[in-house]
Amino acid sequence: MPVGVPKVFYALPDEEEADWIDLYHCLYQERLIVICGDLNDEAVNQIVSVLIYLSTRDDSKEFFIYINSPGGSVTSGIAIYDAMRFNNTPVNTIAVGISASMASFILAGGDIGKRLAFPHSRIMIHQPEGGSEGQSSEIVHEAQEVVRIRRQVARIYAQRTGQPLDTIARDMDRDQFMSAREAKTYGIVDLVAAEK
């Protein structure tokens, strides 16, 4: 049985009295963004909109993006990455649970020194997937586009991790799972959270 979005008692910055607002609105006001589930167009549009809107209001207050996602559309992941990288607001990324596929790309896209993984989180990189049907010329064109995107994603991973491009390309050939510590060694994250 769905429970809906919980409400919390919260005073907005310009308000004297607190009121009940939905949890996500409260988190956004504190610059906390949670990415969970598939990276589909609807979720990505909301995340990009929040990043843009809040960074235009105050670009000095840091974002904290918590990620627990199996990934999704490569273009959606690139859209979030671009929104994170092309504004002046510092961005912390935190892996909670699973950060796979384009979710690991977003995780790596946080500011260097501000990328964290919880100790039991899992991180996975792999090559972008594509599929097409239709006339052979359309299939060839789509395959060329998938190869172009794969190169783009690999270049960005190499840039963000410090790994050689050929290592990234080889590791993306299949699902490459990593523990939090392995992801730190690889350069996807900078820190692994310590347990209490």
Swiss-Prot record:
GO terms for biological process: protein quality control for misfolded or incompletely synthesized proteins. It is found in: Plastid, Chloroplast stroma. Keywords: Chloroplast, Hydrolase, Plastid, Protease, Serine protease. Its EC number is 3.4.21.92. Belongs to the peptidase S14 family. This is ATP-dependent Clp protease proteolytic subunit. The keyword Transferase does not apply. Component of the chloroplastic Clp protease core complex. The active site is at 101 (nucleophile), 126. It catalyses: Hydrolysis of proteins to small peptides in the presence of ATP and magnesium. alpha-casein is the usual test substrate. In the absence of ATP, only oligopeptides shorter than five residues are hydrolyzed (such as succinyl-Leu-Tyr-|-NHMec, and Leu-Tyr-Leu-|-Tyr-Trp, in which cleavage of the -Tyr-|-Leu- and -Tyr-|-Trp bonds also occurs). The keyword Secreted does not apply. Cleaves peptides in various proteins in a process that requires ATP hydrolysis. Has a chymotrypsin-like activity. Plays a major role in the degradation of misfolded proteins. It comes from Pleurastrum terricola. GO terms for cellular component: chloroplast stroma; endopeptidase Clp complex. Gene3D superfamilies: 2-enoyl-CoA Hydratase, Chain A, domain 1 (3.90.226.10). InterPro entries: ClpP (IPR001907), ClpP/crotonase-like_dom_sf (IPR029045), ClpP/TepA (IPR023562), ClpP_His_AS (IPR033135). GO terms for molecular function: ATP-dependent peptidase activity; ATPase binding; serine-type endopeptidase activity. HAMAP family: ClpP.
